[in-house]
From Swiss-Prot:
Catalytic activity: (S)-malate = fumarate + H2O
Transmembrane segments: none
Name by which UniProt lists this protein: Fumarase E
Origin organism lineage: Bacteria, Pseudomonadati, Pseudomonadota, Gammaproteobacteria, Enterobacterales
Family of the protein in this entry: Belongs to the MtlR/FumE family.
Keywords of the record: Lyase
Main EC class the enzyme belongs to: lyase
Keyword Transmembrane: no
Gene: fumE
Role, per record: In vitro catalyzes the addition of water to fumarate, forming malate. Cannot catalyze the reverse reaction. Cannot use the cis-isomer maleate as substrate.
């Protein structure tokens, strides 16, 4: 499995022109980051253990291929902070929600605002979050949906890259 560089992540996310494709790509990237992190959980990397126990667990059809199961394991073993666990879970849940919708909301919709208002890696960045809030609740003459959508996309991209940096073993 190839390791994604920050440039790869930025390129892939920037190429997405709507919220659905953005969240699908973000979900795939976060799952790949978790897959790359998982082997570091196993202390004894004896060849036999890796071959007969670790590899089957991490295989694409294995039990740890599910992002929610893998996250719970990482968190339960104390290898992930609560805020990070919450952010990745939140991304996963929002992606699953969008996947079930007939019409996907846009970057500037209230549903998306509710989502980003609960992403710790965005809300903990006071300058970014305050700028988003100011634009979201600004007088209409100042507010531009295209500008706000671009800013939301940037904030979500920063959240994904911040999360991936935390998943470095």
């Amino acid at each position: 499995m190839a390791t994604l560089t920050e440039d790869d992540v930025l390129e892939q996310l920037d190429a997405q022109d709507n919220l659905f494709s953005f969240m699908k790509t973000a979900h795939t990237i976060l799952l790949q980051g978790i897959r790359q992190f998982l082997p570091s959980l196993f202390v004894d990397n004896d060849e036999e253990i890796v071959e007969y126990a670790v590899k089957p667990l991490l295989a694409q059809s294995g039990p740890l291929d599910d992002i929610d199961v893998a996250l719970r394991l990482i968190y339960a073993l104390g290898k992930m902070d609560k805020w990070l666990y919450a952010d990745i879970t939140h991304f996963s849940q929002f992606w699953h929600y969008l996947n079930e919708q007939d019409e996907t909301p846009g970057f500037a919709d209230d549903m998306t605002w509710d989502f980003i208002s609960n992403v710790n890696s965005i809300t903990r960045n006071a300058m970014l979050y305050d700028a988003l809030k100011a634009m979201k609740f600004a007088d209409f003459s100042v507010w531009s949906e295209a500008r706000f959508s671009g800013m939301v996309k940037t904030a979500l991209t920063l959240a994904v890259t911040t999360t991936l940096k935390e998943l470095t073993p």
